[in-house]
Amino acid sequence: MVTIVLNKYKLLDKIHIGQQKLEDLLFNLKSEVKPIDENNIEIEINADRLDLLSSDGIARAIKGLLEKELGEAKYNVTDTEYTLIVDNVRTRPYALAAIVYNAKIDLEELIQFQEKLHGTIGRKRKKVAIGIHDLRKVDSKTIEYKEVPLSYKFVPLYGNKELTISEILEKTEQGKLYGNISIANGVSPAIVQDDGEVLSIPPIINSNKTRLDENTKDFFIDVTGTSFEAVAQTLDIIVSNLAEAGGTIGRVKVLKSANSSQLSSPLFLHKIQNVREEYVKKILGIKTSKEEICKHVMRMRMNCDIENGVIRVTVPQYRVDILNEIDVVEDIAMSIGYNNLEPSKYISTNYGSYDYMTLLERKIRELGIGAGYVEISNFVLIKDEKLFSNKYVKILNPVTEEYNAVRDSLIPGLLDFLSKNQHAKFPIRVFETGDVVVYDSSTDTGFRNDKRAAYAIMDNKVSYEDIQAPIHYILKSLGLEVNYKEENNNIFIEGRSASIFYENEKMGVIGEVNPDVLIRFGIEYPAVIAELYISEIGKRLTNQR
């Protein structure tokens, strides 16, 4: 959910209804209203409904439910003489721009709208950043988006003197927060007039030159980012909501210098979504018709036509939450009102049961305890230096370097546990079951989840045979007659380790820990370890059932 704060009276004045009616209609849109004080209300909105993050967007939606306006909102659009030249900006390659004339907006609300978009579709400015400028203060009709050196100077927003970009990164709050997103190789993305004056360095900060004030009615809007689709959608949402406030949208010519391509911005990205009448009836459990379905779609501010018996919904640019047929059905439910949908009776009763892998893991844990081992539990995250493989999932922004990777084996965690418990009474026999993430080139992500069990013994004197016997007992108790094939790796002593096979399928590894590995973990006593691949064991046992 996304929370916005609006002036209650300004919002009610746009739709001419009472507060209780407003709350009821917003509830239909899956939003909740909470009073803050006499003048202001707090509204919780679903994070996918970006079009509702301002009072004008809410007013547009409610006018549809009240049937004051039906179908897609129509706005005045005109061509302008403004041009945006997009150069090769390596860290944020995409940029679009638009003009909005004569929009009557609340400045505080516009800034809130901008920041809520930054936090949602913008992913805290990493994916998309928005610059909103006072058009009166833009001196050039040709604007360029390009890389500039960090020595470039301009007066940052609310500043009173020129600073270099390097100084902005060091001295301003925005520079400290967002500088690491886009700065690379000593250059920064920048929106620049044709005379070289900087208007903004996205996603960090605007220039004070084009600062908005209460008298601003004409806007130059730039949107930059790492995803062209997200940039286009964000610009469409902003200009649509400003146009809802009485503004006229001005197109900007966008030229891509790298390939000389040209387009007109904003793009107003529409899509056609076909909806089946029977599908709507099935999902909502109602009796309806194509005409009734179209009526509800129009109430949700989308266009709807029936062509050759097919319901065709035209999704406007501001409804980026509509991805497929089920999203349209959800909108129909909102138009009808969830309270007006009759709950259906249960036509069958089903009983849940444990997943087979859960039962298998439970059985393996019981066998481990029965074999004299104590169960421990480590974190799934681990320090990458403790891993033995170089193919693992790295955490991009870890809270601490102690947990900067996802484990691909349970063995490092057991060794770490042994290193911290060398003072305990010997022998130490411990085991763990849990999830790991292993490299797998056949999957979409290159990795897959795997379930494993690992066993360790540490004593003054311990050998391969000490771990092999209980492992063989556990596997035999599961109904598996396994073979052990000598295989060497960097964890175990050469000639004192093996892989565990069942019918030519590898089920685990076992061996005496290499002294170099013991030294690496600070362990002063010999240790033996085995790791079983529960996921593979489960597949084989399932085939035998």
Swiss-Prot record:
UniProt domain B5: residue ranges: 268-343
Cofactor or coenzyme needed: Mg(2+)
Any one Gene Ontology cellular component term annotated for this protein: phenylalanine-tRNA ligase complex
Localisation per UniProt entry: Cytoplasm
MF-aspect GO terms: ATP binding; magnesium ion binding; phenylalanine-tRNA ligase activity; RNA binding
Superkingdom classification of source: Archaea
GO biological process terms, semicolon-separated: phenylalanyl-tRNA aminoacylation
Binding sites annotated in the UniProt record for Mg(2+): 321, 327, 330-331
Record's catalysed reaction(s): tRNA(Phe) + L-phenylalanine + ATP = L-phenylalanyl-tRNA(Phe) + AMP + diphosphate + H(+)
EC number: 6.1.1.20
Matches recorded under InterPro entries: aa-tRNA-synth_II/BPL/LPL, B3/B4_tRNA-bd, DNA-bd_dom_put_sf, Phe-tRNA-ligase_IIc_bsu, Phe-tRNA-synth_IIc_bsu_arc_euk, Phe-tRNA_synthase-like_B3/B4, Phe_tRNA_ligase_beta2_arc, PheRS_beta_core
Family as reported in the entry's similarity comment: Belongs to the phenylalanyl-tRNA synthetase beta subunit family. Type 2 subfamily.
NCBIfam families the record matches: pheT_arch
Subunit structure and binding partners: Tetramer of two alpha and two beta subunits.
HAMAP family: Phe_tRNA_synth_beta2 (MF_00284)
Name by which UniProt lists this protein: Phenylalanine--tRNA ligase beta subunit
The species this protein was found in: Saccharolobus islandicus (strain Y.G.57.14 / Yellowstone #1) (Sulfolobus islandicus)
Gene from which this protein is expressed: pheT
